[in-house]
Amino acid sequence: MGLLHSLHAPAAALLWSCLLGLAAAQEAILHASTNGVSSLSKDYCMYYNNNWTRLPSSLENATSLSLMNLTGTALCHLSDIPPDGIRNKAVVVHWGPCHFLEKARIAQEGGAAALLIANNSVLIPSSRNKSTFQNVTVLIAVITQKDFKDMKETLGDDITVKMYSPSWPNFDYTLVVIFVIAVFTVALGGYWSGLIELENMKSVEDAEDRETRKKKDDYLTFSPLTVVVFVVICCIMIVLLYFFYRWLVYVMIAIFCIASSMSLYNCLSALIHRMPCGQCTILCCGKNIKVSLIFLSGLCISVAVVWAVFRNEDRWAWILQDILGIAFCLNLIKTMKLPNFMSCVILLGLLLIYDVFFVFITPFITKNGESIMVELAAGPFENAEKLPVVIRVPKLMGYSVMSVCSVPVSVLGFGDIIVPGLLIAYCRRFDVQTGSSIYYISSTIAYAVGMIITFVVLMVMKTGQPALLYLVPCTLITVSVVAWSRKEMKKFWKGSSYQVMDHLDYSTNEENPVTTDEQIVQQ
C-alpha cells in the first residue's frame, strides 16, 4: 500500500503545500575580550539581518566597542539611557516590552554603535516593511541569553567586543550534493515507476485480470479535475499554516514522521523482496510474514522517532531528515500516477503559479512586506520549529571560528523533486508502453539542466529561488519537443493505454490505441 492509501487528502495536501524551502538568518561572530587582557577572550555566535547592516569579513577589520549591559532597563524611552551615555558603545538589552526597532531608534539617538538583543530565541526578527526601519542605521543583532550569561561569568563586566561576518568560498559544494540527491531521486523514482508498469503489463493475461488491475490503479490516478482540486487545497492549507503556524507545524512534523517511515519501509522492502537470503517467515493472523520485514518496520519507525526527538540537533539530525525525505519523495513519485501529459502540464503549471505567487506576489499583500513562503521557511512569529519538507545539506566549517554558530545549510524543497519527478515517471511509463527510452532520458537531463540554471541564478542573485520557476519550463518544453519531433504528441498528450502483449509486442498498441481517459469512461 502506498502513501496515498494511508493519508487523508487534506493531510497530504498540507504536506504538499509547504514543499519549498528558502534560506533564513545571517550568522556572525561576536568576539568578546576583557579590556587590557588580550589573552582572555571568547567567541560567540550572533544573528543579524545583512539587509540592514554590513559587517567586516575579518577580525582584524572589525571595530572595537565597549560593551554596556542595559538588561536592567527596557530602553523604551530616552530617559532609560544612563547618565554616562552610550555613545560609541555596544549596548545589550532584553527582548521587549517595546518593539526592537523602538529600542534601536533610542540607542541610535544616544549615539550607540550597536544594539545587541539578548533573547531565548536565536531567530533574527523579520525585517517588516522597509519604510519602518529605513531610518535605523545602528547595527541590530541577536545573541542568546545563555551566551550573554556565559560572557559575564567568563570575562566579567569590563568587556570589549568586535563583530564580523566571515565570508564563505564562492563555490558552494553543498549545491553539488543537493544536485546529486535531486537528480538521483527523480531518476530512480521515474525508473521505479516504469518497472512497476512493466510488471503490470507482463502480469495481465486475461480481461478479468486487466479489469482488476485497472480498478486498483485508478485509486492512485490523478485526473485533471483532481489535480486542480488538489492545488486549491494546497493553497488553502498554506494560508492556514501561515496564520496557525505555531500549532500546525507540529501536525506537519507528525505527518512527516508517519509518511516518511512508511515510505522508507516501502523502499527498503522492495529490495528485501529481491534478496535471496532472509526468507524466514512466521505465521501471524493466518498469513506468512517475513521476519526480515518485521525488523525492517521496527527500523523505519525507529529512524523517524529518533529524528522527531532530535530534529533540532544541527550536527547530525539532517542526515536522518534527508534519508527520510529521499524515501518520501521516491515513494510518492512511484505511487502517484498522472495518466497523461495533459495532467502533467496542468499540475506543473498550477504549482509553478502557486510557487511564484507565494514567493514573489504575497509580499505586496502581507502587512510586514514578507512573502508567505519566506515566513514559513524562517518560522513565523520567531518560532524555532521548522517545517520538515526540505533536503538539508550543511556546509563544512571551513573557518573554525564559525563552529560557535549553528551549521549553515543549503536546502531544497521536496516539491522541487516530487513535482518534476511525477512528469519523469509518466515519461518512463510512456516509454515502457511504446518500447523506447527517449522521453525518460530527455526529461531527466532537462531536470538536471533546470537545477543547474536554478543554482546559477541563486549564486548571481544571492537569494533563495523558487526552483520550479526554472524546472517546469525546462522539463515541459523538452518533452514537448521530443513528442513533436517523433510525431507522438497526440498520443503523448492523451496517454497511452495498457495492452496485453506477448513478448512486449508494441505493434498492437500502434494499431488500436486506447487512451487512459477512455479507460476511465469505460469503467
UniProtKB/Swiss-Prot annotation:
Q: Which residues cross the membrane?
A: 176-196, 225-245, 248-268, 289-309, 316-336, 345-365, 404-424, 441-461, 464-484
Q: How does it sit in the membrane?
A: Multi-pass membrane protein
Q: Any idea which GO molecular function terms this record carries?
A: aspartic endopeptidase activity, intramembrane cleaving; protein homodimerization activity
What main location does UniProt list? Answer: membrane
Q: What happens when the gene is disrupted?
A: Knockout mice increase susceptibility to mycobacterial infection after BCG administration compared to wild-type mice. Mutant animals have decreased numbers of DC2 dendritic cells (cDC2), a smaller sized IFNG+ CD4+ and CD8+ T cell fraction, and decreased production of IFNG by splenocytes compared to wild-type animals. They also have profound B cell deficiency due to CD74 NTF accumulation. The protein is required for optimal IFNG production by T cells after mycobacterial infection. Mutant mice confirm depletion of conventional cDC2 cells in lymphatic tissues of null mice.
Q: Which SMART domains match?
A: PSN
Q: Which GO terms describe its cellular component?
A: cytoplasmic side of endoplasmic reticulum membrane; Golgi-associated vesicle membrane; late endosome membrane; lumenal side of endoplasmic reticulum membrane; lysosomal membrane; plasma membrane
EC number of this enzyme: 3.4.23.-
The entry's function note states:
Intramembrane-cleaving aspartic protease (I-CLiP) that cleaves type II membrane signal peptides in the hydrophobic plane of the membrane. Functions in FASLG, ITM2B and TNF processing. Catalyzes the intramembrane cleavage of the anchored fragment of shed TNF-alpha (TNF), which promotes the release of the intracellular domain (ICD) for signaling to the nucleus. Also responsible for the intramembrane cleavage of Fas antigen ligand FASLG, which promotes the release of the intracellular FasL domain (FasL ICD).
SUBUNIT field:
Interacts with ITM2B.
Which protein family is named in the record?
Answer: Belongs to the peptidase A22B family.
Which named protein is this? Signal peptide peptidase-like 2A
From the broadest rank down, the organism's phylogenetic lineage runs: Eukaryota, Metazoa, Chordata, Craniata, Vertebrata
